[in-house]
């Protein structure tokens, strides 16, 4: 399995952006991904050293539109902590004059 198939997207919330100051990054990952697979994928894609990986399963929420009910998709979230000597991961694009 390719590393880019395991890491789906970064999670951008207030809590996850506060964790970035401590070199902890949050990603949505494949539902079947293990900690070892997430560690190897992050190290390969971003060229960093991973200290630890914490994974949690987030259940889908019940949603209603009128009388119809449904569920949002469940997901798997990984919080990846980098070593102190590792480079930061650039999730946001730098704002330059050409990027307006």
Curated annotation (Swiss-Prot):
GO terms under biological process: translation
GO cellular component, as recorded: ribonucleoprotein complex; ribosome
Recorded GO MF terms: rRNA binding; structural constituent of ribosome
Alphabetized InterPro entries for the sequence: Nucleotide-bd_a/b_plait_sf, Ribosomal_uL23-like, Ribosomal_uL23/eL15/eS24_sf
This protein's UniProt keywords: Ribonucleoprotein, Ribosomal protein, RNA-binding, rRNA-binding
Keyword DNA damage part of the UniProt annotation: no
Domain of life: Bacteria
Subunit and interaction comment: Part of the 50S ribosomal subunit. Contacts protein L29, and trigger factor when it is bound to the ribosome.
NCBIfam families assigned: PRK05738.2-4 (NF004363)
Function recorded in the entry: One of the early assembly proteins it binds 23S rRNA. One of the proteins that surrounds the polypeptide exit tunnel on the outside of the ribosome. Forms the main docking site for trigger factor binding to the ribosome.
Family stated for the protein in its record: Belongs to the universal ribosomal protein uL23 family.
Official protein name in the record: Large ribosomal subunit protein uL23
Designated gene of the protein: rplW
């Amino acid at each position: 399995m390719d590393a880019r198939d395991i890491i789906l997207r970064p999670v951008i919330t207030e809590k996850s952006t506060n964790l970035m100051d401590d070199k902890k990054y949050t990603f949505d990952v494949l539902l079947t991904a293990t900690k070892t697979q997430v560690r190897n994928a992050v190290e390969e894609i971003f060229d960093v050293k991973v200290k630890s990986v914490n994974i949690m399963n987030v259940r889908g929420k019940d949603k209603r539109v009128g009388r119809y009910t449904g569920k949002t998709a469940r997901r798997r979230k990984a919080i990846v902590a980098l070593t102190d000597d590792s480079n930061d991961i650039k999730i946001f694009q730098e704002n330059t004059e050409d990027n307006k």
